[in-house]
Amino acid sequence: MRFEHAQVCGFEGALRGMRNPLASWKRTDSLYGLEKYDDMPEFHVAASWVEATNPDLDKNDYKYEVLQDKYAEWLRNNGILKFDEEKNDYVEYAFIGPKDMDLAERLMNAGTEHRKFLRQIQVSVDITAPLYWWKEFDTYKVGTTANSTSTMHKLASTPITLDCFEIDDYIELDEDFKYEIDKLIEFLEYLRQKYNETKDKRYWKELIRWLPESWLQTRTVTMNYENLRSICHQRANHKLTQWHQFVQWVDCYVPYSAQFVFGKPVALD
């Protein structure tokens, strides 16, 4: 299973919109933009975090600088949305301040009708996964869109090998087991070659018929943070290992997933 070309957008509009009900836009303390890496304002936002969490701490205190460095690192780890080396190291960022995060957390805790802003933060990613996992992912129709590679048009265009299937946790139980799998792949490759030689659609139909559900398919998926929140909460303990990989990807690579997806408070070690 692979996750590639991930992009996240919509933080600025979503967090501005969450302040619409009380017209509290002047209280926003987040910064968004496109800057060279060395010019990013993460330390400015980090200072806001230090002052919000330690209001009695003097700016000249050594601890202030230590905390500011920690918050700046946390902001870089979460707030860098896109880094493009081909464009002179420009970085797209969304550094969320403590006031905006506090409001966001209160809205998320209040329920789905209040956390509408999560549905305005969009994620796009190319996922390569077996067909049996995609069947379960298709349960999530509302708010998600997927554009897949075509099994119908492209299945016969490349050789069929073991690498075409999900083998992340593949176990060779014994020689007989491995032999049967190898024979199945040889059979599928035979059908593919016969179709290419004869253009007889009956071979193509048999290839489709006997293709295992472990066949890897790539889809470009768009979804929002509310989708991620639902999926990760519902599938965290699923017996399919691919769901654990999905949850792990969200946890490790999706910006601010700890707070916006898993509901954890901002806590620095």
Where are these regions (language model features)?
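Family-specific signature for flavin-dependent thymidylate synthase
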Residues: M1-D269
